[in-house]
Amino acid sequence: MAMLFVLPSCAQNNKPMAKIYDYKALNNKGVEVDFSQYEGKVLLIVNTASKCGFTPQYDGLEALYQKYKDKGLVVIGFPCDQFAHQEPGSDEEIAEFCRLNHGVTFPLMAKTDVNGANESPVFTYLKAAAPTEEYKGFKAKATRTMLKGISKSVEKDSDILWNFTKFLISKDGSTVKRFAPVAEPASFEKDIEAML
């Protein structure tokens, strides 16, 4: 018996022809979200955690959302428990934590795997579109090496190393930039402004 597998064609630059708008994911209330509703918006997609050293970045993400949401920015948080079990709560507990401690009003999705056999197709796409983040300077490069050493879910070079990896997607979905967990949200505000 022969089996036929059809794979999506790739552009000459080895990036997938698909765009973020071709994907769906469950939000934190269990409702399917069709990302096609975000076409024409700048998206900032982040894998998040409530018990991480980078958790205070929720404040910076919310500040960006409040400043630019009327200009077309949508921040979307994907809670993830793959990195040292720093997101142990239920979807409801995570949402309450984010609201009470960080004033989060941007959309939160259901707890999601971002690496491995059960990773969300959204993150499979994002990692293919932007396979590595930029680490500038010795301290940042040392952080990358350390994170890669302790991240048990990392199997491929494109895998996410830790919580608060950020993906910035242009209005037409053609450009995807990836920012390291150590990158504070305000540090790439000019990139957001350029896309709006």
How does the language model describe each region?
Residues 72-89, 104-116:
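Thiol-based oxidoreductase modules, predominantly thioredoxin-like and allied folds used
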Residues 103-182:
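Thiol/selenol-based redox catalytic cores and closely related redox-interacting motifs
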Residues 39-42, 50-51, 55-79, 98-102:
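Conserved helix-turn-beta segment immediately C-terminal to the redox Cys motif
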Residues 1-17:
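Bacterial Sec-dependent N-terminal signal peptides
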Residues 20-21, 43, 163-165:
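Short loop/turn microsegments at loop-to-beta-strand junctions
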Residues 12-36:
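N-terminal "domain-start" segment that seeds a small globular fold
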